[in-house]
Amino acid sequence: YVVTRVVTAVDSNGFYLQAPIGDGDVATSDAVFVFTGSSPSVAVADAIAVSGPVQEFFPGGTGTRNLPTTQLRSDELEVCSSGNALPAPVILGSSGRSTPFTDIDPDALTVFDPVNDGLDFFESVEAMRVTVEDAAAVAPTNRFGEIFVVANQGAASAASGLSERGTLNIAPVDFNPEKIQIDEDTGILDFDFPSVAVGARLGDVTG
């Protein structure tokens, strides 16, 4: 498979590649992670032509039952140009796309429903640039450096388990798929990742 796209982020073993202009279908992602196996020789804003097989990668192996991510294994790549504009991020929040608020995947993967199923929603933006609008932390930074947030300071989550203290509680019919994990991926960020408390307001977060 061959694609020509713009590099949006570089990791230690690959990079993220996204179409400058999407196809207009909100059910499908316009980006993919390109696996190189070692530090790639590309930079953010490079336009890349890359070829290789498409694979489903299971973090930790298939025996872990972790959910897979789609990746392109880089067999050949060419830098076509540099300094290109990055694709506009998808807004996650009230002024863009709203995440589902109750269901993760009630149909056991039999129906692809990104409007109502949290699992399908996040697959539809997999590997893409996104902005979590007016994010608020619903848990303190954990020992792995991860921060869990909701958009719009939880305004849309108030009826979906947001407590007075700012934590997000589950219920028998509400598993809060709107909770978004922000992770400091080694080598991507050029600043110190913050340590936050519940209720911290982070503003718009793009990644």
Each language-model region and where it sits:
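Extended non-catalytic accessory segments flanking core domains
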Residues: Y1-T206
